[in-house]
Amino acid sequence: MANQRIRIRLKAFDHRLIDQSAQEIVDTAKRTGAQVTGPIPLPTRKERFTVLVSPHVNKDARDQYEIRTHKRLVDIVEPTDKTVDALMKLDLAAGVDVQISLG
């Protein structure tokens, strides 16, 4: 696979889970002889929700919730055929969203 690059974007709500998955990808790629850049932490998206506690009165009583979406980027610069096969067989955690693009 000459002059190719595999870009892997990871998304998860738990930062420990995404770091563990990124490390598994990097270790697998390096073990098969590919050159790896990353994992690069991308900005964390914070969604905040405000909910009224009382169903009728007391507008001052509110709860605030937050969902954080952590993102990482891993570039595999010179993948080999072994690298692609090893990445296909890799079993990552269920809470991690993986997007792969070839460039």
Curated annotation (Swiss-Prot):
The keyword Ribosomal protein applies. Signal peptide: none annotated. GO terms for cellular component: ribonucleoprotein complex; ribosome. It comes from the Bacteria. InterPro entries: Ribosomal_uS10 (IPR001848), Ribosomal_uS10_CS (IPR018268), Ribosomal_uS10_dom (IPR027486), Ribosomal_uS10_dom_sf (IPR036838). The keyword Ribosomal protein applies. One of its GO terms (biological process) is translation. Keywords: Ribonucleoprotein, Ribosomal protein. GO terms for molecular function: structural constituent of ribosome; tRNA binding. HAMAP family: Ribosomal_uS10. Involved in the binding of tRNA to the ribosomes. Belongs to the universal ribosomal protein uS10 family. Part of the 30S ribosomal subunit. This is Small ribosomal subunit protein uS10. It comes from Alcanivorax borkumensis (strain ATCC 700651 / DSM 11573 / NCIMB 13689 / SK2). The lineage of its organism: Bacteria, Pseudomonadati, Pseudomonadota, Gammaproteobacteria, Oceanospirillales. The gene is rpsJ.
